[in-house]
Amino acid sequence: MKRALISVSDKNGIVPFAEKLVELGVEIISTGGTKAAFEQAGVPVTGIEEVTEFPEMLDGRVKTLHPAIHGGLLARRDTAEHMEAIAAHNIKPIDLVIVNLYPFQETIQKPGVTLEEAIENIDIGGPSMLRSAAKNYAAVTVVVDTADYDAVLTELQEHGATTFETRQRLAAKVFRHTAAYDALIAEYLTNITGETFPEKVTFTYNRKQVLRYGENPHQDAAFYTEPGTIENSISAAKQLHGKELSYNNIRDADAALKIASEFTEPVAVAVKHMNPCGVGVGENIEEAYLKAYEADETSIFGGIVALNKEVDAKTAEHMSKIFLEIVIAPSFSEEAFAILAKKKNIRLLTVPFAGNMEGFEKTSVNGGLLIQANDSLVEDTTSYEVVTEKQPTDSEMKALLAQWKIVKHVKSNAIVVGSDKQTLGIGAGQMNRIGSALIALEQAGEKAKGAVLASDAFFPMDDTVEAAAKSGITAIIQPGGSIKDKESIAMADKYGISMVLTHVRHFKH
């Protein structure tokens, strides 16, 4: 290895790396700020303009886009015609390229960033050099990740060159890196144009964790996160205690966070298998947790609990009495953390809560991808319609609105029975609506008397209303829209139940 081209925005570790290369007899070629850093550190360096015999121009936009650079990168060492061609133009082969790119992601995440600032942080020369070097990985070693410095240096020190396998691995990483970089730029500019569903989409994710296994032990899995921090998301969670999250933990935690984010008042959400098993609302977080626990004392065991306020010592004492997989909250008091951390198998996570979740959700299907807006519509309750003779009382309306927030997060067909403070029965995932209703009503038992019922979609028949009435339900909220709405309304009137139509459906598959 005779010649290395180094141009980096992240200068961590680059000076000692270059010093080792010089000790191995490698000539260093560099640009701009990287060259200045080498000169300041006393590392011998050749400026890029000495190689190209052309000055940097356009405020640094054009530095390395030159045949003297790309010829030295792309020439096949095993092809005589290539080597003769670059020799004829006094172009020397470049054997090692170390480049990382302008910080586009960090730039667009800055508050108040302008379009001009974003544009100026779109790297052109860097990706071009990386791609040229990666294409010719048979001869050229290319490094885009500072984490690879030590491994490359070790091979050079021990063997005088890198192995083919190493170069191939590094080239693959480069193409992943440049593809992700371009995808981020494309997404940023597409969002500016307001185009929701462009003809092509490319998403970039960063691997956060290789998981022990997936949904089942025979399935391999990993967890990838979107670039940047998305508040009130599991990808933004910080783990304070416990072993690594599993695939199922992550999915359940995501479901719990989505429900907890619906509420501004203190709420506790218990989830099992991506469905809520208990949701409690209170004047404080202790009361909210106790309501969630009372909602289903059996199912909460081994569950995931998300709370939207700091966990205090009293709440932690209650939680410590049962086995919980995960507790997620904005924060834990010192006393609460000390209490819960005594339990070896519990995982404690903090997540920044910032209101409702917006954006888009993606679902894979064989051979494709479905993309839709998150079900985060802020509904205009003034458009809700009371269609029965009986009007809901203020307390009933408060309970209806609370359960309406919850039912949209339950797998369809979804029925939730509850009060303004807690769920009392949840029927999820049945293939017919009456089936889900009967499950929810049976779970609620005697507590259904005086409670309300929420349905994620319309009633195809009046049987759910009749079952609710016979269990003591006093008010129902549902979207409406069935050809048999009149029959359901008539059944409600027959039993003196109030019914509110929202005209918004909340299927969840």
Swiss-Prot record:
One annotated GO molecular function: IMP cyclohydrolase activity
Residue span(s) of domain MGS-like: 1-144
Assigned keywords, A-Z: Hydrolase, Multifunctional enzyme, Purine biosynthesis, Transferase
InterPro entries in alphabetical order: AICAR_Tfase_dup_dom_sf (IPR024051), Cytidine_deaminase-like (IPR016193), MGS-like_dom (IPR011607), MGS-like_dom_sf (IPR036914), PurH-like (IPR002695)
Catalysed conversion reaction: (6R)-10-formyltetrahydrofolate + 5-amino-1-(5-phospho-beta-D-ribosyl)imidazole-4-carboxamide = 5-formamido-1-(5-phospho-D-ribosyl)imidazole-4-carboxamide + (6S)-5,6,7,8-tetrahydrofolate; IMP + H2O = 5-formamido-1-(5-phospho-D-ribosyl)imidazole-4-carboxamide
Pathway entry: Purine metabolism; IMP biosynthesis via de novo pathway; 5-formamido-1-(5-phospho-D-ribosyl)imidazole-4-carboxamide from 5-amino-1-(5-phospho-D-ribosyl)imidazole-4-carboxamide (10-formyl THF route): step 1/1; Purine metabolism; IMP biosynthesis via de novo pathway; IMP from 5-formamido-1-(5-phospho-D-ribosyl)imidazole-4-carboxamide: step 1/1
GO CC annotations, alphabetized: cytosol
EC number(s) recorded for this UniProt protein: 2.1.2.3, 3.5.4.10
Disulfide bridge partners, by residue number: none
Keyword NAD among record annotations: no
GO biological process: 'de novo' IMP biosynthetic process
Family: Belongs to the PurH family.
Domain statement: The IMP cyclohydrolase activity resides in the N-terminal region.
Name of the protein: Bifunctional purine biosynthesis protein PurH
Organism of origin: Listeria monocytogenes serovar 1/2a (strain ATCC BAA-679 / EGD-e)
